[in-house]
Each structure stands twice: as C-alpha cells, then as structure tokens.
Amino acid sequence: PSSWTPLPESPHKHSHPIQGQGVSGGVQGGQVYSLQALILQSPLSPEPPIILVGQQLTPEVIPWLRRVSGLVLAQGGATSHGAILARELEIPAVVGVGSAHLEYLLSFPWLTVDGDGGIVQGLKECPPIAASPATNSLPQHQPEAPDSPEFPTLPVPLKIFATLNQLTSLNALRDNLPDGIGLLRSVWFFLDLWHGEHPHRRIAQGHHGELRTAYQKRLQQCIQAIHPRPLFYRSVDCRAAELQSLGGQETFPWTVGGSFAHCFDPSVLNLELEVLHQIDCGASDLHLVLPMVRTVEEFRGCRDHYQQFLRQQGRHQSPLPLWIMAEVPSILLQLPALAAAGVQGVVIGPGDLCQYWLGLSREQSGPLTYELDHPLVHQVILQLLRETQRLKLPTILSSHSGHIPQNYLEDYLRAGLWGITTELPHLKNLRQTIAQSWHAS
C-alpha cells in the first residue's frame, strides 16, 4: 500500500484516560496509527497529525518519527531509546501504558497524548490540538551570544556537550551552543542507511563503498556544525536492541556484542575507521568511543585492529584518540589496566550502568527507573571519577535528562568530572541550573 490506512472506528462511546509515564513533554492530538501496521504497510505519504501506538520502538519506524505528532508505547521507561528519541525530536510521548491497554487505545480513531502528565485519551472526533510537532520545522534563528542569560558562562571548569541521535537535530545543535558533541550515537544516527538490514549483512552484500560515502557525508555535516569543537563518536554496538529485528541478525551472537563484536567481526569497525580517517580526524578533533567494553582483552583486540588498520594506511601514529564507554560494573576494577593498554578517556553511561548494578531494565516503566538519582549509582560514578582522575583520564558523564542533584554534581566536580553530555532539549536548562546553583552557593 502507498498510503496510511486509518484504524476502524472505536465501538466505545466514551473513553477513559490511560495512565502511563510521560517521557517527552507537550500535549498533542492526532489520528491513531498502529506501529505494527506502519511496519507492515511501509507507507509512503503519511499526513499529520499522527499518533503512533505500539509495543515498543523498532528500527523500521525511526525514519517516520520526524513526521509523527505523538508517540504511545506499551513498554519502556524514561531512559528507553524510544523516550530518548522522542525528547530529541520534541514529540510528546507516553510509555509504559501496558500491553493490556493497547487494543483499547487502538480502537479509537483519535488520541490526545499528554507527555507531561503521562495520560493518553481516546477520542471519537478530531481533537482541537492538531498541529505538527515544532521539531518538524526546526528554527533557523541565530543563537544567543555566549554569556547571555540564555547561555551563561559557567563558574566551574566543566564542559557541557550535546548528545546527538538524529541528523535532523543539527539546527537545534547550532542554536544551543554546546562545547561539542559529547556522544554521537551511531546506531541511531546511521540506522536509515542500513535499509532494514543488519550492518554486517549490508556490508557482506557488497555495500561497503556506498555506506562509506553516505557515512562520510553525514558525519562531515556534524563536524561542520560544531567545528572546531570536539566530537565523540560512539562506535556501532552490534548487540544493541535496536538492531535485533533487522535482517541478517540471526547469524550474529547477540549475547556477546559491544566491543567484543568488533573482535568477532571487524567489518563495521573497518567502515567506521575508514570514514573517520577520510575526514582527517587530526584536524577535526574526533574521538572514537568503543561501546560496552567489558574486559581489557576486548579493548586490546579493538586497539590492535586499529593499529593494523593504521599500518595498512601507511600511518605510524594515530590522530584518533581511543575512548571507552563505562557501562558495566567490571570497568571499575580494570581502569588501571585499561589506561596502561592505551585508553585515553572515558564516557560514563549511567543508563546501562544503572541497570547492570541494580538488576533493572532501561525498557521498564514505573518507579524503579533510576539513572543519576540513586545513591548506589552516585557512589559508583564517584569511584569511577576518582580513579579516572588518578589515572589522568578525562571523563564525560552522559545524562539523558540533564538533571543532576546539586550535591551530587559538586561531588562529581571535586572527583574530577571533565564534562557532561545531555540531550539537546536539556542543554540550556542544565547550563542555567549549574550557573544559578553556584552563584547562589
């Protein structure tokens, strides 16, 4: 089919609101479309306003997110990937409504989504709120000057970086004046270039050159938007949940992804290394961040492969610093060995770190969704920072919401925190909060 097929009219004469977890603010109304039907129909020309409703976000749907007005998911929490993307694109979103409520919500032709209150309301008629999301037409105004009320100079030696998931966010990136891109999530950023297939299969089918050209063009746009500020490129994590539904993943050992995947099959890492070096990483202040490093051996495997790549290119020294993600508890015990092996910096990922320490899932909803506000996570981050400071490794803390309690932040700064990276909608608030807190103290 070449168009979106509306769902049949609800048999319910009256609706009752469904409570979930609001993860991306705003109130929006629109016509209901099933996420599963969207995947099966592959629509070509959807007309807003559209509210997508489904179990969870899958890769096939991501290119359509820029065209929808609201998102409702049965699964997920505040740090789930669907929530992260919705916030970056400024789409009102409610997650965790529960599978039992999906059929009920899908029986209505219209919905309103309250991303602030976490409420979804089924409607028989078109709601009054029917505008497209503001993000679908990003502002083109000139950014405020540094040290304005919008962007105050921080009274502490701390870098504020932006986390980037989508190419469409580049205009917002320019408007928010971050100190650079603290984390470019390659899995999301390049997902549409894989055309529904796992990257390993796509490369094996002979698309290496095509992918390299497309990767380079897209990454170059990011560098031009922030030059001369740094960009921290997180390498593709082939174990990522976002890739598990793609064609060809069945041949890959999903239980051992992360950086081990690059040791098992370096084809994706080779593609990334070629692109990063073609861009002249020495002049562009690029950093390669290896994902989900569990052991020193995994890092050494990636490092050795990179050194072999350099020799093949006729280079003897690397202009590309190698960083790692600190996402699993084992990193805390191995930092000295990792530094000795050549790690040059660390990005702390509290979303994964929290779920592995506390036995939680980032895709779950409800009160047990912690990130930076749990005392145990706070203590783990403090220990990581004290050790990286002792080893003279610059460290960035990734925060989805940008909300860090002031007393925690003071502890992190004393322990040697170098930078924070957060989602674009939270950059201004984070900078202003830090400035106001220190001026008041």
Predicted regions and their residues:
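Conserved alpha/beta-domain cores
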Residues: H141-S441
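Acidic, glycine-rich flexible loop/linker segments
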Residues: S2-D179, L183-L184
